[in-house]
């Protein structure tokens, strides 16, 4: 592989959502049967979420990831033989091992390239995209498939109103290719392991038994405070790394956690609401899938145009966060 390659560009995107759409009203009815009280008004007021897509039982992360991958590959005009690298960002893999990326590779009929998962929860796509970009810049690969995919409904405690209304399932993907001109301009990844307990799913499988608490648990107020602080700083730092300012960014594509975080972040960055891609109302929080889902939606509806600058940001359990600035 030539070492002269210096840059990577996003050549295509794709996404996939499970067919089942559950509105807040429908979810409220289901939860009422468990003795949990909520309503569309309660959920929208606190989160901005109006509906979510939920996978049927038995539909795994690799299924969603594969379909998103196929759509991204079609958009980029590449086939399985072109893929030198597949990275899947997920916190809900099909198995302990093999990796979800290897399952996707098999589903696509791709052979021989590297395939592995990364796990940084809702920051996962930023971590995966930055990793793939580094492989391309190093001249190790010419074409990489990067996927964020989750079946978060499988790790929710449906008796916990504070979390079960927030999340959905889905997958988004991009294809990046080697290029002579920069597409991905700058990226930064960070973590603070001292904050593990504010957002976690602390269960495990050991000796044939599930140990610990297998469900997602969250301190919502702590997550909000941490998220808006680190995302603000990260956005400014990654723009500075690229020799740009926030004003020069055409689109902000943040992790779709809830509308309150998105609005607060936009105000801190002095970014107008019409420059922020928002899909959380339709998708809910899809963890590692949220950023590529939002990116693909905005590319396909014509909002994001070639040549525009897009700032993608993730933040999640760990505590982790990351930003990627790209010219489309």
Swiss-Prot record:
A Gene Ontology BP annotation from the UniProt entry: secondary metabolite biosynthetic process
Residue span of region ACP-binding: 256-260
Active site residues per record: 122, 255, 285
Record key words, sorted: Acyltransferase, Cytoplasm, Fatty acid biosynthesis, Fatty acid metabolism, Lipid biosynthesis, Lipid metabolism, Multifunctional enzyme, Transferase
SS bond partners: none
GO (cellular component) term, any one: cytoplasm
Keyword Isomerase on entry: no
Domain of life of the organism encoding this protein: Bacteria
E.C. number: 2.3.1.180
Pathway where it operates: Lipid metabolism; fatty acid biosynthesis
Residues in coiled coil: none
Claim: Membrane is one of the keywords in the record: no
GO molecular function: 3-oxoacyl-[acyl-carrier-protein] synthase activity; beta-ketoacyl-acyl-carrier-protein synthase III activity
One Pfam family linked to the record: ACP_syn_III
Subcellular location: Cytoplasm
InterPro entries according to UniProt: ACP_syn_III_C, ACP_syn_III_N, FabH, Thiolase-like
Reaction catalysed by this enzyme: malonyl-[ACP] + acetyl-CoA + H(+) = 3-oxobutanoyl-[ACP] + CO2 + CoA
Family the entry assigns: Belongs to the thiolase-like superfamily. FabH family.
Subunit structure and binding partners: Homodimer.
Protein function: Catalyzes the condensation reaction of fatty acid synthesis by the addition to an acyl acceptor of two carbons from malonyl-ACP. Catalyzes the first condensation reaction which initiates fatty acid synthesis and may therefore play a role in governing the total rate of fatty acid production. Possesses both acetoacetyl-ACP synthase and acetyl transacylase activities. Its substrate specificity determines the biosynthesis of branched-chain and/or straight-chain of fatty acids.
Note on domains (UniProt): The last Arg residue of the ACP-binding site is essential for the weak association between ACP/AcpP and FabH.
HAMAP family with a match to the protein in the record: FabH
Database matches in NCBIfam families: fabH, PRK09352.1
Listed name of the protein: Beta-ketoacyl-[acyl-carrier-protein] synthase III
